[in-house]
Amino acid sequence: MTKTRQETDTMGKMDVDASRYWGAQTERSIHNFPIGRDTFVWGRPVIRALGILKKGAAQANAELGELPADVADLIVKAADEVIAGKLDEHFPLVVFQTGSGTQSNMNANEVISNRAIELAGGEMGSKKPVHPNDHVNRGQSSNDTFPTAMHIAVVLELNERLYGAVGKLRDTLHAKAEQYKDLVKVGRTHLQDATPITLGQEIGGWVAQLDYALSEVKHAGEGLLDLAIGGTAVGTGLNAHPKFGDLAAKKYEEETGYHFRSAENKFAALSAHDALVQTSAALRTLAGALMKMANDVRWLASGPRNGIGEITIPENEPGSSIMPGKVNPTQSEAMTMVATRVFGNDATVAFAGSQGNFQLNVFKPVMVHAVLESIRLISDACLAFNDHCAVGIQPNEAKIKENLDKNLMQVTALNRHIGYDKAAAIAKKAHKEGTSLKDAALALGYVTEDEFAQWVVPLGMTHN
């Protein structure tokens, strides 16, 4: 039988597993919200952010004379363990709880309180010498702490995970674009043949999309540096020292290296999460760029004998349980599925962000979960696509030449010399009779052989 201890809150007593640091409110949440427990338990980013939040709050309160130094020191030591990931198993709650994140805020308060009590040699559950509300939550409300943790978590994940992962893929593609900048191939619009481009130009388009999308994410991320801390329950700062918000934000900057600041308008910081909505929208843009790239790659690699086949990609695993020897563009397929998930997450965030009522938005947990999932999926997908696909992209030069030689849209180069109508007649004749453009042009007498050779130069048509 599991050994228990009694914990109390304002609603009474609760039996808690004696090996766990959480208290009565967390235990109630475990019983009241058994929703997606195997899938939607908070991960490292939010738990770490809660630790950073509580550590900085204790330091700020101590400097302002709101907490005894010895109590603050105990809180800081316990919070450091939360930040380091040593207490993750003591954060059992799921995303789907109260929309302000109150249960998760109290989970952090209770865990830090009991661990601090243990460090002091006290009795867990006694709330002495460190009380979860009076000390760990001093000058705070769930309404300002949880959105603060949301922003801290997302900023850290963007900087420590996403930017590097996307940048790695971007750099690989940029190198490929430079490598193949003079390799001329068929361009395509409307899924039909178009005028020539180089393979480098095609890949360079993907690079430019990633550059733009990443710049948009970084711009949106700047808004996440504004924190709700100091607003307490409704944005007025009731029960917090007037300097608490600014000082706490400074402590978060010292802990993380990112320039966090207490938001100028706390009412908006509690009741709306526009910076998170904007960040999600930018992630959606990034996912769209990755979707386009992945689709282009699998189309260009289609075949091997009856598709476009202008590039080859690494053969990573068997592609069929019934067709021997078949190999599929699996990294592209994984990337496109990630993109659709990010699109769905953004729809969740956009709707949830619009649902603030009066002084509070109560969709906070699902918003930050969706954004963090998008960041993680995009990051992992970019690394996988880079390592198992992009680095191995190679041109199939024979197929590229074959397709280019058959491309009727090279006739566009004749427009300025013989006019659109005559050029169109050449293309139609060549297509109808299955001949080359050159043969059709000479047969119609619109150009000489020397003129055709001078005017129809594929590389020159790329303006490379």
Swiss-Prot record:
Family annotation (Gene3D superfamilies): Fumarase/aspartase (C-terminal domain), Fumarase/aspartase (Central domain), Fumarase/aspartase (N-terminal domain)
UniProt GO MF annotations: fumarate hydratase activity
EC class of this enzyme? Answer: lyase
UniProt keywords (A-Z) are: Cytoplasm, Lyase, Tricarboxylic acid cycle
- GO biological process, alphabetically ordered: fumarate metabolic process; malate metabolic process; tricarboxylic acid cycle
The record's Gene Ontology cellular component field reads: cytoplasm
Name its pathway. Carbohydrate metabolism; tricarboxylic acid cycle; (S)-malate from fumarate: step 1/1
The site feature described as Important for catalytic activity is recorded at E333
Spell out the reaction equation it catalyses. Answer: (S)-malate = fumarate + H2O
Task: Quote the InterPro entries the UniProt record gives.
Answer: Fum_hydII (IPR005677), Fumarase/histidase_N (IPR024083), Fumarase_C_C (IPR018951), Fumarate_lyase_CS (IPR020557), Fumarate_lyase_fam (IPR000362), Fumarate_lyase_N (IPR022761), L-Aspartase-like (IPR008948)
- Transmembrane helix keyword on record: no
Question: What is the protein's known function?
Answer: Involved in the TCA cycle. Catalyzes the stereospecific interconversion of fumarate to L-malate.
- What HAMAP family does the entry give? FumaraseC
Protein family per UniProt? Belongs to the class-II fumarase/aspartase family. Fumarase subfamily.
Describe its partners and assembly state: Homotetramer.
* Other facts: There are 2 substrate-binding sites: the catalytic A site, and the non-catalytic B site that may play a role in the transfer of substrate or product between the active site and the solvent. Alternatively, the B site may bind allosteric effectors.
Database matches in NCBIfam families: fumC_II (TIGR00979), PRK12273.1 (NF008909)
Q: What is this protein called?
A: Fumarate hydratase class II
Which source organism? Deinococcus radiodurans (strain ATCC 13939 / DSM 20539 / JCM 16871 / CCUG 27074 / LMG 4051 / NBRC 15346 / NCIMB 9279 / VKM B-1422 / R1)
- Which classification does the entry list for the species? Bacteria, Thermotogati, Deinococcota, Deinococci, Deinococcales
